[in-house]
């Protein structure tokens, strides 16, 4: 990997494909460099982990309920057998206020199933301002490819 990475080719590929699969060096640093270049180019960015994502469209765009972790002995008479449900704001709702492209950078993307990755690709096709970068594991050098190529679609 060159010392100075301008990010121009990465931005062009991201705009063309919408959803990219990345393999990054395990020592890190290259993804934050690309995020900084994207922010400087006018993109809004959101860095998140893919673990516990669930349904991508609901998690990212709609008000949804979650159940907090069980912290020991608590009264079940208060909330019933299913437990307490808390409403959570969507992750990307406040980033779509202007006509600025938004990049969602998902760490640990290797835990996502094929159907979840396809749902992310479809989400990028439906929402023209959304770009998704999924880190699919480690590599000796920084490389990326369209998610549709990785999935064989």
UniProtKB/Swiss-Prot annotation:
EC code(s) of this entry: 7.1.1.-
Enzyme class: translocase
Gene Ontology CC annotations of this record: plasma membrane-derived thylakoid membrane
Keyword Signal part of the UniProt annotation: no
Cellular compartment(s): Cellular thylakoid membrane
Family: Belongs to the complex I NdhN subunit family.
Complex and partners: NDH-1 can be composed of about 15 different subunits; different subcomplexes with different compositions have been identified which probably have different functions.
UniProt protein name: NAD(P)H-quinone oxidoreductase subunit N
